[in-house]
Design a protein with these regions (language model features):
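A short, charged helix-loop
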Residues: 124-164
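Basic, nucleic-acid-binding surfaces and adjacent catalytic neighborhoods in DNA/RNA-processing proteins
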Residues: 22-50, 58, 63, 159-289
């Protein structure tokens, strides 16, 4: 699933291509009986309302909240897209790739260009909300603070994670109600850098290591954005291109490989933590319990 860096990369791409453009038509082939009573475009009745409110509107800008893409329109409504497992947006003339061929939605603009949505497993969530009600909507109201905000300092980081004092740190880092945007990939990389075992109990981890985690979190997420996201799986940017963060993994999906930490001779292992995989070095990542 795309995490904070992949979603931010997509938002940056939207602002460089479709910001200021007017939507002139929409097409989609989502239609699921499981969404008949939901406010998503997979519900044909909601899609009819969606089209009516979106066509003819100018895109003011795109933003990110956690793993959600927010496309603000001129009529004070916002298109919310959660890409889920396999979704990604593609702008006109994108690079051809098998992962870019599962088109289930597109927007056409006043310049004749299109914005496509590829979603191989059709899990994505796409809806429309009044912009003024976004913050308190069921989609965003539960989310924790943004880890890259300037105001998100160590004190807040420490406080948020200690809301789950007996939780395993890998699981707690991925809890979207505590900190928004961190998932499987980046939690592994954060813990590798901080030297903390993924099953360490939160309230047993020394403050020194929490400070290392905080520093690692800022560095890893920024690095993820700098490298255009992670395309170990099927994520692509709006040009249809792969990100490059997967070339810089130190833990995630490196099972059986020698640890890259200087002076460490550990071998990366993989375990399951609360149904999610965790990759770590058993030599330099300390277990606190």
């Amino acid at each position: 699933m795309p995490e904070l860096p992949e979603v931010q990369t997509t938002v940056n791409g939207l602002n460089s291509t479709v910001k200021g453009r007017k939507i002139v038509s929409i097409w989609n082939d989502y239609d699921s009986p499981y969404f008949r009573n939901k406010d998503e475009i997979k519900n044909p009745k909601f899609y009819a309302k969606f089209k009516k409110l979106v066509i003819g509107q100018k895109i003011l800008k795109a933003e990110r909240r956690a793993k959600n893409i927010l496309i603000h329109l001129g009529n004070k409504h916002t298109i919310l897209i959660h890409m889920k497992m396999t979704g990604h947006l593609l702008y006109e003339g994108y690079k051809k790739d098998p992962f870019n061929s599962h088109i289930h939605l597109y927007f056409q603009f006043d310049n004749g260009k299109h914005l496509y949505f590829s979603d191989m497993r059709k899990f994505a969530k796409i809806t429309l909300i009044e912009t003024g009600k976004l913050k308190h909507s069921i989609h965003l109201s539960h989310l924790g603070p943004e880890p890259l905000d300037k105001n998100f300092q160590f004190k807040i980081f420490n406080f948020q994670l200690h809301k789950r004092p007996k939780g395993k740190i890998k699981q707690v880092l991925m809890d979207q109600t505590l900190i928004a945007g961190i998932g499987n990939i980046y939690s592994d990389e954060i813990l590798w850098r901080a030297g903390v075992h993924p099953t360490s109990q939160v309230n047993k981890i020394p403050e020194k290591n929490f400070k290392e985690m905080f520093k690692a979190m800022k560095e890893v997420l920024k690095k993820g954005i700098d490298f255009g996201g992670d395309s170990m799986s099927d994520y692509r940017n709006i040009k249809g291109e792969k990100g490059r963060f997967q070339e810089h993994h130190r833990a995630y999906q490196r099972k059986g490989k020698i640890c890259d930490k200087k002076g460490c001779k550990g071998v990366i292992q993989r375990i399951i933590v609360a149904t999610r995989s965790a990759h770590f070095c058993p030599t330099h990542q300390k277990l606190f319990k």
